[in-house]
Amino acid sequence: MTIRNQRFSLLKQPISSTLNQHLVDYPTPSNLSYWWGFGSLAGICLVIQIVTGVFLAMHYTPHVDLAFNSVEHIMRDVEGGWLLRYMHANGASMFFIVVYLHIFRGLYYASYSSPREFVWCLGVVIFLLMIVTAFIGYVLPWGQMSFWGATVITSLASAIPVVGDTIVTWLWGGFSVDNATLNRFFSLHYLLPFILVGASLLHLAALHQYGSNNPLGVHSEMDKIAFYPYFYVKDLVGWVAFAIFFSIWIFYAPNVLGHPDNYIPANPMSTPPHIVPEWYFLPIYAILRSIPDKAGGVAAIALVFICLLALPFFKSMYVRSSSFRPIYQGMFWLLLADCLLLGWIGCQPVEAPFVTIGQISSLVFFLFFAITPILGRVGRGIPNSYTDETDHT
């Protein structure tokens, strides 16, 4: 190719060459399984949420007297509005399902270990942003569960010493959840997804700095192939399966993952018998409720994210993949079962025996992160790379 042809080649242009480097020619370990397809699925979910959210915002009115009716207007009067709303509402659930599977895959294969510490920490930040975005989005329909969920969760900020009450007043825009709160939440709910896009691009760039982990947990620069067409085709299978799964929820069970009380307009004078957040918040909500003291519950929630952020810095792991670490593998499955149990406890009333079960489950959750550094020293498996001859004993 001549110098002139190189200059006008599409793949030599700055933007297209960057896309080609990261999405086409990106060297990928040849043994990646379908568990590595959830990253691209998460990106698809984010795009779905942004596109449907933009169209919903065209018809939504962020006012306490009109918000609930505007949602019903979307459902009844806007052409295709019911589809937009169900895609957006169930899309949030699909997004969290994909991300939870992505996180647990990372835990199982120790994708957080060196040199991918920054990738994992960015992922935790993205997860936290998702939680905040989903919570404030759940408030926007202004139903009973929206209003009382906002009241309960935002009041938790009052547990912060010195500045807690000031933060709550700032969040509310007054002395109670009202019109100012709804306007603030709508504005933030529109903004945060675009911040999520930026954080996701940073996450992808950080991943591509050192390359993807693999099921064996070993590092090699030799056994790699181009991402396109091999893993595009492999991811396509996951995309089709996801589309079928997503469609079943949208067309056959659009309200199963929601709460019926949210079809009742918000009434500050009537408290629901049982305030329950969306299902994807339930494990964290159960940990919050397991501690009677408000400040202790908030501290426990903060500790959850601190544990996740600290996980890559437990410098004690000689072997990454759980396939070669039977003790850690058992602890991983215990953690997964414990999180499912916490999710069930989160939707139960605050009474015996659910409180006790929640406290025990919360303790097991934190014990996993306390024991992980010790488990890294137990057992001996394959080396860090094909050429690593270092004796770790």
Curated annotation (Swiss-Prot):
Residue spans, topological domain Mitochondrial intermembrane: 58-80, 142-178, 253-293, 347-353
Topology within the bilayer: Multi-pass membrane protein
Amino-acid positions noted as binding heme b b566 in the UniProt annotation, renumbered to this chain: 102, 203
UniProt superkingdom: Eukaryota
Residues holding a ubiquinone: 208
Cofactor list: heme b
Segments on the Mitochondrial matrix side according to the record's topology features: 1-33, 109-116, 211-229, 315-325, 371-393
A molecular function GO annotation: metal ion binding
Subcellular localization: Mitochondrion inner membrane
Cellular component, GO annotation: membrane; mitochondrial inner membrane; respiratory chain complex III
Binding site for heme b b562: 88, 189
InterPro entries: Cyt_b/b6_C, Cyt_b/b6_C_sf, Cyt_b/b6_N, Cytb/b6-like_sf, Cytochrome_b, Cytochrome_b_C_euk/bac, Cytochrome_b_N_euk/bac, Di-haem_cyt_TM
Subunit details: Component of the ubiquinol-cytochrome c oxidoreductase (cytochrome b-c1 complex, complex III, CIII), a multisubunit enzyme composed of 10 subunits. The complex is composed of 3 respiratory subunits cytochrome b (MT-CYB), cytochrome c1 (CYC1-1 or CYC1-2) and Rieske protein (UCR1-1 or UCR1-2), 2 core protein subunits MPPalpha1 (or MPPalpha2) and MPPB, and 5 low-molecular weight protein subunits QCR7-1 (or QCR7-2), UCRQ-1 (or UCRQ-2), QCR9, UCRY and probably QCR6-1 (or QCR6-2).
Function: Component of the ubiquinol-cytochrome c oxidoreductase, a multisubunit transmembrane complex that is part of the mitochondrial electron transport chain which drives oxidative phosphorylation.
Other notes: A stretch of 270 kb of the mitochondrial genome is duplicated within the centromere of chromosome 2 resulting in the duplication of the gene. The expression of this duplicated gene (At2g07727) is not demonstrated. It is also probably not RNA edited and therefore differs in all the positions known to be edited.
This protein's name: Cytochrome b
